[in-house]
C-alpha cells in the first residue's frame, strides 16, 4: 500500500472533536458579546494631552470651567496674570453682565464687550492641580469639623477642590462679619475662585504690605497695631486663625489693611489652632521689628488675642479703632533681653487647649470656685507652665541649693514623721506662687549632665577591672556542664 492510500485511510473521531469544542465554548462563553454592535460610542482613551498645562494652572479641564463662567455671564474676559504663588496663580478679569454673551452670526464668535472702566474688576484665583508644589495641606484640614467628610489627600484634584471651597467659605465669613476688610467672594467652581479685585486704577493691583511705601514712622506703628487688632477680631468674631499671616498676605487698599489668602485658615477648635496663632504672632513681630519699631512680647499678644475680656477696656470689642487705641496705650513694649528670652520659652511651650492637657488637681480648683470659666483655667495653666520654665532658666542654681538643704533636713527626721509628711503632701495642693520645677534629663543643667556622664564612665571602668573575661567564662561554664 502506498503512502497516499495510508493517508486517505486515516480518520478523526467526530466525538472527540465535539468534546474539545464544547470545553472551549464553556471556558470562553462569558467573554463572547452577543448584543448588537454599537458604532455611536467611541473608545475612550486617556492621553497626556488631556492634562497639558500652561502657566502651571491652565489645563483643558480648567479652561472648560472658565468657559462656563463666560457663558453664564459671571466674567466677560480673562486678562493677564497678576501674581504667582506656591498654590495658585491670580488673573485679572472684568465682570460679566450676568447674562449669556451674544454670539456674532457672521463670525460665530462671542461679541467683545467694550470696557469703559465702569464695570467691576475681578481677581480669578486658579489653584494648581497637575503641578503641585504645596503638598503639605493635611495638617490644615485634619480635625476641621467643616471638612470631616470630604477629605481626599490622595487625589490632587479632589483635594484642591476642597481647598478652594475652604478659602471661599473663610473669605465669605470674614467679609460678612464686617470687622476686617477683605475682598468680596463672588463664586467658586472646582479649582477656580472668583473674588473682588483690589485695584489702584488702570488695572494695577494695590500693593502688598511688604511693598507699601510708608509715609512716616507713625504709619508703621499704625499698621502694626492694626495687624494685632485683626488677629483678635479674626479669633473672637470670625472664629478663625489665619495660620499664614504675614506682610505677604495683607494688602493696603484705600489706606486700609485688607486680609487675603485665607485658604489655610482654621477654626479655634482645630487641634493646632493655638500653634498656628503663635506662628502668626511671630511672623508679624519679625516683619515690624525689621522695619525698626518697638514691638510687643509674643506672649502678651497671645493673651490679648484669646482673652474674652480686656482689662481697662470700655469701648466696643468689634470696633477696630477702639482696639488700636487700646493696644497703643496699654500693651507693654519688649525692651530687655529677658523679654527676648521669655519669647523663646513661649515658642517652645506646650499650650493646653483641652481637658486632656489638664491635671486632676486643676479640676479640684475649678470645683472649689477659684476659676469661673474653663477657658480661664486653661489660660492659668499656660501661665503656670510659662512661669515654671522661666524660673528654671534663671534661678536654677538657687533651686539646687534649696533642694539640697531640704533633703539634708529630711534625713535627720525619724521614719514615722517622714511617713506622716508624705501622706500630707499627697493630699495637699500646690501653691500658685511656687513654680513647678521641670524634671527629667531634657531639662538638666549642662554642667550636671557632663558630671553625671563622667561618673557613669568611671563606674563602668572600675567594673571592667574585676570583670571575668569572656573566654574564661565559657571554659568555666563548659567544665560545670561536663561534671554534671
From Swiss-Prot:
- Note describing how the cofactor binds: Can use both Mg(2+) and Mn(2+) in vitro and shows higher activity with Mn(2+) but Mg(2+) is likely to be the in vivo cofactor.
Q: Where is the active site?
A: 244, 261
| SUPFAM superfamilies assigned to the protein according to its UniProt record, in alphabetical order | Protein kinase-like (PK-like)
Q: What is the effect of changing residue 244 to A?
A: Inhibits cell growth; enhances association with pre-40S ribosomal subunits; inhibits 20S pre-rRNA to mature 18S rRNA processing; translation initiation-like defect
Q: Show the ranges annotated as biased composition (Basic and acidic residues).
A: 442-461
The modified positions for Phosphoserine read 402-403, 409, 416-417, 419
Task: Point to the regions of Basic residues compositional bias.
Answer: 462-484
GO biological process annotations for this chain's record?
cell division; maturation of SSU-rRNA; maturation of SSU-rRNA from tricistronic rRNA transcript (SSU-rRNA, 5.8S rRNA, LSU-rRNA); negative regulation of transcription by RNA polymerase I; negative regulation of transcription by RNA polymerase II; positive regulation of rRNA processing; regulation of exit from mitosis; regulation of kinetochore assembly
Q: Region Association with (pre-)40S ribosomal subunit: list its residue ranges.
A: 440-484
Record's catalysed reaction(s): L-seryl-[protein] + ATP = O-phospho-L-seryl-[protein] + ADP + H(+); L-threonyl-[protein] + ATP = O-phospho-L-threonyl-[protein] + ADP + H(+); ATP + H2O = ADP + phosphate + H(+)
Task: Provide an example Pfam family for this protein.
Answer: RIO1
Binding residues for Mg(2+)? 249, 261
Q: How does it assemble?
A: Interacts with CKA2.
Q: Which family does it belong to?
A: Belongs to the protein kinase superfamily. RIO-type Ser/Thr kinase family.
User: What name does this protein carry?
Assistant: Serine/threonine-protein kinase RIO1
Q: What is the lineage of its organism?
A: Eukaryota, Fungi, Dikarya, Ascomycota, Saccharomycotina
Amino acid at each position: 500500500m502506498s503512502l497516499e492510500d495510508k493517508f486517505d485511510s486515516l480518520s478523526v473521531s467526530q466525538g472527540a472533536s465535539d468534546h474539545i469544542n464544547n470545553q472551549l465554548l464553556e471556558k470562553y462563553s462569558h467573554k463572547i458579546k452577543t448584543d448588537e454592535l454599537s458604532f455611536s460610542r467611541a473608545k475612550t482613551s486617556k492621553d497626556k494631552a488631556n492634562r497639558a498645562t500652561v502657566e502651571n494652572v491652565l489645563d483643558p479641564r480648567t479652561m472648560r470651567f472658565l468657559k462656563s463662567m463666560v457663558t453664564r455671564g459671571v466674567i466677560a474676559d480673562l486678562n493677564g496674570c497678576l501674581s504667582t504663588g506656591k498654590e495658585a496663580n491670580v488673573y485679572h478679569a472684568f465682570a460679566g453682565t450676568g447674562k449669556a454673551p451674544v454670539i456674532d452670526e457672521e463670525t460665530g464668535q462671542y461679541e467683545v464687550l467694550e470696557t469703559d472702566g465702569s464695570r467691576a474688576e475681578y481677581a480669578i484665583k486658579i489653584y494648581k492641580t497637575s503641578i503641585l508644589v504645596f503638598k503639605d495641606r493635611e495638617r490644615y484640614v485634619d480635625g476641621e469639623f467643616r471638612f470631616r467628610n470630604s477629605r481626599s489627600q490622595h487625589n490632587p484634584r479632589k483635594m484642591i477642590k476642597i481647598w478652594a471651597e475652604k478659602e471661599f467659605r473663610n473669605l465669605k465669613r470674614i467679609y460678612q462679619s464686617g470687622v476686617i476688610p477683605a475682598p468680596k467672594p463672588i463664586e467658586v467652581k472646582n479649582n477656580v475662585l472668583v473674588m473682588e479685585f483690589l485695584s489702584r486704577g488702570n488695572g494695577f493691583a494695590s500693593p502688598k504690605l511688604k511693598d507699601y511705601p510708608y509715609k512716616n514712622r507713625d504709619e508703621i506703628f499704625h499698621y502694626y497695631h492694626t495687624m494685632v487688632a485683626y488677629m483678635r477680631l479674626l479669633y473672637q468674631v470670625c472664629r478663625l486663625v489665619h495660620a499664614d499671616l504675614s506682610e505677604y498676605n495683607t494688602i493696603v487698599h484705600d489706606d486700609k489693611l485688607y486680609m487675603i489668602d485665607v485658604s489655610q485658615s482654621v477654626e479655634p477648635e482645630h487641634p493646632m489652632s493655638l500653634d498656628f496663632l503663635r506662628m502668626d504672632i511671630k511672623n508679624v513681630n519679625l516683619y515690624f521689628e525689621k522695619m525698626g519699631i518697638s514691638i510687643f512680647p509674643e506672649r502678651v499678644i497671645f493673651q490679648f488675642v484669646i482673652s474674652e475680656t480686656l482689662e481697662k477696656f470700655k469701648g466696643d470689642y468689634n470696633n477696630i479703632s477702639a482696639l488700636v487705641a487700646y493696644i497703643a496705650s496699654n500693651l507693654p513694649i519688649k525692651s530687655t533681653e529677658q523679654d527676648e528670652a521669655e519669647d523663646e520659652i513661649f515658642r517652645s511651650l506646650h499650650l493646653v487647649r483641652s481637658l486632656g492637657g489638664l491635671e486632676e488637681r486643676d479640676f479640684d480648683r475649678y470645683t472649689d470656685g477659684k476659676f469661673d470659666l474653663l477657658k480661664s483655667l486653661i489660660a492659668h495653666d499656660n501661665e503656670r507652665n510659662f512661669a515654671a520654665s522661666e524660673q528654671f532658666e534663671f534661678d536654677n542654681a538657687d533651686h539646687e541649693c534649696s533642694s539640697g538643704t531640704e533633703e539634708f533636713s529630711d534625713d535627720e527626721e525619724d521614719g514615722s514623721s517622714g511617713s506622716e509628711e508624705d501622706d500630707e503632701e499627697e493630699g495637699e495642693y500646690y501653691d500658685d506662687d511656687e513654680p513647678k520645677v521641670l524634671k527629667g534629663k531634657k531639662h538638666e543643667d549642662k554642667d550636671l549632665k557632663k558630671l553625671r556622664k563622667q561618673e557613669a564612665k568611671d563606674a563602668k571602668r572600675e567594673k571592667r577591672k574585676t570583670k571575668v573575661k569572656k573566654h574564661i567564662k565559657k571554659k568555666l561554664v563548659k567544665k560545670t556542664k561536663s561534671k554534671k
